[in-house]
Amino acid sequence: MKGERLLSLKERSKEVYWKRRIFICRTFDIPVYFIFFQYALRFLLSEKEDVPPHKPKLIVGGERRGTSSFFKRKKQRSVLGKEKNYLPDIDIQEHLLIIFSVRSSLPSLREGRRSSPQTETNFMEKQTFIATCLFGLEKLVGEELDALGCTRLGTIDGRVRFEAPASEIPWLNINLRYAERLLIEVGRCPAPDFDTLFEGVRSMPWEDYIGRNDQFPVKGHSIKSRLVSLPDCQRIIKKAAAKRLGGAYGLEYLPETGVKYQIEFFIFKDEASLMIDTSGTPLHKRGYRPVSTEAPLRETLAAAMAKIARPRENVLFRDPMCGSGTIAIEAAMIMTNTAPGINRGFAAEEFPWLDGKLWDDARDRALDAIAETEFEAYASDISPEAVKIAAENVRRAGMAKHIKVFAEDALKIKTEGRRGTIVCNPPYGERLSTVKEAEQLYRAMGRHFATLDSWQIYVLTSDDYFERLYGRRADAVRRLYNGMIRCNYYQFFKNRH
């Protein structure tokens, strides 16, 4: 049988693998080249009855664009119909390279994933994800996921679990404004001890995501659990995943030279969640802030502060202690409906089972969604250096039309006869200045901001005695975290005593 003959070629080949529906065979054996090429031609001429039964391999979202840069391609029509083939120049220096396009794959020869998520209908329709976030932002993240059409499954501190199609990975990464990372949940298992953890991790379908040559480093956290040693947890999880992948691909050694899949674990109350990171760089890194002032505010937290303050077109938005300008920029991005991740890259762009066209389409949709608005914001700071940095960040974010940046003492601002909202992040005394200086500033803020009749004031600080120092009780207080610093977000809706 020709199919059996082709299977025997695998043993004589030095390397056989799939790359985006392109079959590549490298070999030093000249006779193998002619035998294999003969089979290839017959296969392209529709002699498919000799092919062993198999399921067609699909790419999530369609065929991915582009191929590796190590060979050149020539496009021409296939003798089988309208499908395009890519027949590159053959370079015979150290080895022979034979490439031909096929309509369906031979799973026993596929070097990548023996069993891929794209072969399962439910992978396209439903995948479980985890959106991580700063403590206190879970509600905003959940509401955002609802608006993006996802199905929430549950929430714990700093994590929102939900379902969505795998094809939505690009759209979610580009649009999530308050989340820190988007993780694929591979599985969950009990973890009262290392043996149970090992067996649980080994039972998970890692080969559905990770190829035989791919990298899979491990990191994570353990909270309120008996397994407290993170290095030991990493070692056990790595070993279990390697055991599963080695068995799936028939390998004793995994080279880990390919695409990087960052495995993350979260063990909470002796239950482990195993995930793969699709974001790479945390989502709070939008790409518009290459340089920042000392103790910068994380972009996701700044966006949450702006959202809670409800920016409006007819109300002046002011940050009189702007630092890097992050709060004003995030407010303008909300008002213009600018996707926060539109100008950055993501780890999942390298995943071969996720169609590259999905990323292009998601970015095109995000660009089309940007809205015109009359929103206006002032970002000012007493430091000329901070003003310079903020102005550059505003320019890089594309928000110069909506944000005016200038130097000014926060204790000298005036209403100018306009309605307004102040949102600020004054020094805490923990990261900037001293506690005594911060307390003096809070007292001065209370005296001066009281003169801004009818303006709404929003202040983020870690000082639990802020209201006493400010001289007024807040109308609402919300617990938020700036990194690992526990803060309170004080909200004064009617600025009158």
Predicted regions and their residues:
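Compositionally biased, intrinsically disordered low-complexity segments enriched in Pro/Arg/Gln/His
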Residues: R5-R12, V16, R26, Q38-L45, ...
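Short hydrophobic targeting helices and cationic amphipathic motifs
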Residues: L9, W18, F34-Q38, L44, ...
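A short, flexible beta-alpha/helix-coil linker loop
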Residues: I223-R226, P282, P427-R431
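C-terminal catalytic and target-recognition region of SAM-dependent MTase-like enzymes
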Residues: A410-K412, E416-H497
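S-adenosyl-L-methionine
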Residues: E125-L137, V141-E143, A147, V160-L176, ...
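Non-catalytic nucleic-acid substrate-recognition regions in nucleic-acid-modifying enzymes
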Residues: N122-V259
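Intrinsically disordered, glycine-rich low-complexity segments
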Residues: M1-R5, E11-V16, R20-R21, S46-E49, ...
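Conserved S-adenosyl-L-methionine
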Residues: L297-K414, E430-R431, V435-E437
